[in-house]
Amino acid sequence: MTAIRGGSRRAPGLALALLGGVLLGACHGDENAQVNALPGFVSGSVRKTAYDGASDDLLTAGLGKTGLGSDTRPGFANPAQPSAAELRRLAIYSNYRALVDITPNGGYGRFWGPNVDLAGNDTLGEGKIAGTEYLAYSDDGSGRKNVTLLVQVPASFDPANPCIVTATASGSRGVYGAIAAAGEWGLKRGCAVAYNDKGGGNGAHEIGTGVVTLIDGTLATASSAGSSSLFTASESSSTLAAFNSAFPNRYAYKHAHSQQNPEQDWGRVTLQAVEFAYWALNEQFGPVVDGTRHGIRYRPGDITTIAASVSNGGGSALAAAEQDTRGWITAVVVGEPQINVRMTPGVTVEQGGAPVPSFGRPLADYATLANLLQPCAAAAVAATGAPYLSALPMGVTQSIRTQRCATLAAAGLVSGADTASQASDALAQLHAAGYLADSDLLQAPMWDSQAMPAIAVTYANAYTRSRVTDNLCNFSFATTNPVTGAVAAPAVSPMTNLFGAGNGVPPTNGINLVFNGASGGVDHRLATPDASFAGAFCLRQLWTANQLGIGTNVDAVRVAANLQHKPAIIVHGRSDALVPVNHASRAYVAQNSATEGRASQLSFYEVTNGQHFDAFLSVPGFDTRFVPVHYYDEQALNLMWNHLKSGAPLPPSQVIRTVPRGGVPGAAPALSTANLPPIVQSPGANAIAVNAGVIDVPL
């Protein structure tokens, strides 16, 4: 590992970095300088590490296709103190598997995977990719932003034909969060990949011990880490000690508790990741100008750069393209983007020629509503046969659904004399709020898996700039007894492997979402018979009553849908119940057509039977009903590459009518091309009409 000196801060624990590293030096400068200089936002040292493509590599951390596909996750020589290299390996393993279906029947190793080349053929063996990584923080001088930036430069990079692909982390994942979604494609194409963790990352603070994570996942105390931690809660040590006495075994998380509303900066930090990649490429391939330092070979706009990723990372790519004033980004390709659009009057979303009931709502609105209603809507007749995605016994889950419906009815929030009618009304309200009937069977698993409660709580904290000590709406993050759900001390601290195994949004890695009642904190699902309705209702009221500054902070994350005439592709699954297509992609495309008019180069591909979590596709009931959106994300990247390099026209906006695998839940037949029709140049009746602020999607 080599470290390149940047700003005045130096992270502690550099001695724990990968063996064989070195430290290099460079000063900050401007883009007109002849000497390559670190961008001013880079703080501390840059860690440079070479990987041989055999024992370790950029894509699989030495695990190869077989290791990534194995259900046995990589271990640690010393489980109590894993090395940075071991944590990196686990992070790549965990994040890769979190975004794609890893089963052979589901397509791994055949349609995607390290062994599959860009033409879709099994030619790459274990798929290990040699190259170099550059790792650093971006900060504003406060030592509290500490956005992780990472650039991977494959050995196959051609300096005469340079390219960059961004891979901003999805969700609130760490810096490797989009390695499967965009990083893999970029590395195989021979491009440098520019990652960042969006300033949310996987940073946590164990309140009882004061332990925090560092940039490489190793641990330190908050006092010794200082401004070099991924995240440290901002409260004083005395305040945290008092909080720990009243609420032991709690954890602060960066996305939820940094008080920075990090989402407002996601576009900016994605642009910084690109600029950092330019610096790294100049450092590696620029001429030597004074015997030691490198000159500038590439200036803004010289490198073909595709802003890509999925979910939150996809929204970040769109925001970056909108904010790009220096020509860093050439094109955009994103999947299922979580994006909050600033809608203007007259913009309309239609399906089959009729206006949809609701569109363009921000996440703070639809997520808090879904979190309130989904446990009840899950009992609706239309949701019968939904995949079951919970470790709780079915009887417990059914009781939660019945009790949530009853409490909603008592509060006047749903109508009906019995559970069935109350559940049908809850589902009807979700339809009226813009959720498609295509996602009816996903309302239950989105809540049962705790995806929606996790999002509602984390984003409510972020949008209100709450502190961990606020216990917003009586929710907090804690370790719990696996049987009773009550807050309890962990047998082993989850911090040890958090960087490698966590996803940044509790519940994750043994840190759970708890509701703090009169008898203490308990897993929110078990704290009350109606699964902490009071907390869910409180979260909803934050939005509906515009409390604690939530409206202002949500406005700060909205975008204008102005891509500045850059070629772009959005792919989204129609059945998405986490980021509903009416509120995200359809709304964005409609607003873009109003903003850019005929100058827009945006194509939108809506995938029937596609939903948000490809990693769920091996779950019984998911396997038979839903198809991988990732397959079309990769097709879209290939289409954009051909457009940029050979002038091939981008196919027009269209609905892609996929065919579910069918069969028996849990034993669906193998995925084949019969399930996955191609994106076509002439979609005919499947064409999506977009004009002057109106999008009309065929039924």
UniProtKB/Swiss-Prot annotation:
A Pfam entry, by short name: 3HBOH
- GO CC terms of this entry: extracellular space
* GO terms under biological process: butyrate metabolic process
Q: Does the keyword Hydrolase apply?
A: yes
Please list the reactions this protein catalyses.
Answer: (3R)-hydroxybutanoate dimer + H2O = 2 (R)-3-hydroxybutanoate + H(+)
Q: What class of enzyme is it?
A: hydrolase
Q: Residue span of the signal peptide, if any?
A: 1-33
- Is the keyword Signal in the record? yes
Q: Which UniProt keywords apply?
A: Hydrolase, Secreted, Signal
List the EC numbers from the record: 3.1.1.22
The molecular function terms in GO held by this entry are:
hydroxybutyrate-dimer hydrolase activity
**So which domain of life are we looking at?**
Bacteria
Biological or metabolic pathway of the protein? Lipid metabolism; butanoate metabolism
Spell out the subcellular localization from the entry. Answer: Secreted
- Per the similarity annotation, which family is this? Belongs to the D-(-)-3-hydroxybutyrate oligomer hydrolase family.
Query: What function is annotated for this protein?
Result: Participates in the degradation of poly-3-hydroxybutyrate (PHB). It works downstream of poly(3-hydroxybutyrate) depolymerase, hydrolyzing D(-)-3-hydroxybutyrate oligomers of various length (3HB-oligomers) into 3HB-monomers.
Q: What name does the UniProt record give this protein? A: D-(-)-3-hydroxybutyrate oligomer hydrolase
Please give the organism: Burkholderia pseudomallei (strain K96243)
